[in-house]
Amino acid sequence: KAQTEEYDGSSFTEVGDLNTARGGSGSSMNAPNASTLIFAGSPGSGTANTESWNGTSWTEVANLSTSRWDVGGAGDSVTSAIAFGGSISPGVTTATEEWTAADFEIKTVTTS
């Protein structure tokens, strides 16, 4: 579904819908600024679509490099966010990408 709802502390109200309906997407949020970034998701073999919420409507922004679903996300959604992991067809990915309000860039993560 592309439906978006906002919670005011006691009830939900439908607001501007996503441009691309999806499930299994990742997101990052900056609550004081009412901004949100949503990326990836399904149906099909995953999507790279990314949209930004400004408190009123969704806008298409730079897409992920790797289409996927069931992806993790973190960040403030105003200036930067990361998308990590997720499912691809077939299998899973460990790809990590950083969004900087202009584009997604693939990052290499080293663990020890």
Q: Language-model segments: which ranges?
A:
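Polar, enzyme-active/binding microenvironments
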Residues: 1-112
